[in-house]
């Protein structure tokens, strides 16, 4: 019996994109923790040339359709991504980069919802220090208390 190892699609898609840019031919490798309970790091990118590694943390979201059609008319995207504010779990230095990942439909008028061709990834790579600043700035409008979510 072979053990089964699973990887969330968000992490797989990000790793696939990184390896398109930083391939094995350039001396880069990706390492994923064998245990999914490993906290603070989802994968490492290692440079054999420089013998250095960078730690990545992936945060993913579903895409949501904007309720207000006027916002689309004003030039805002039709879809938005909502992320949990993980400020209470954030600790500077745990990862060098945070990846915000989401899928959105580029076939807005299509009735087919599950076809691969109708979904595109959005991948934002944010350095650790900037992620801390972003999470600190996520506040409610009235009371200026930390908000539970932020959107892209």
Predicted features along the sequence, with ranges:
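Mixed-charge (Asp/Glu-Lys/Arg
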Residues: 1-39, 44-152
């Amino acid at each position: 019996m072979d053990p089964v190892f699973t990887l969330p699609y968000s992490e797989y898609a990000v790793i696939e994109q990184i390896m398109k840019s930083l391939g094995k031919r350039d001396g880069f490798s990706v390492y994923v923790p064998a245990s999914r309970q490993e906290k603070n790091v989802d994968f490492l990118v290692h440079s054999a040339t420089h013998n250095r590694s960078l730690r990545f943390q992936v945060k993913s979201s579903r895409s949501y359709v904007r309720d207000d059609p006027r916002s689309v008319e004003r030039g805002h995207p039709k879809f938005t991504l909502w992320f949990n504010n993980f400020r209470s779990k954030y600790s500077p230095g745990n990862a060098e980069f945070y990846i915000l990942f989401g899928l959105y439909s580029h076939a807005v008028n299509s009735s087919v919802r599950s076809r691969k061709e109708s979904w595109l990834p959005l991948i934002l790579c944010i350095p650790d220090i900037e992620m801390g600043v972003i999470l600190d700035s996520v506040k409610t409008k009235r009371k200026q208390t930390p908000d539970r979510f932020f959107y892209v």
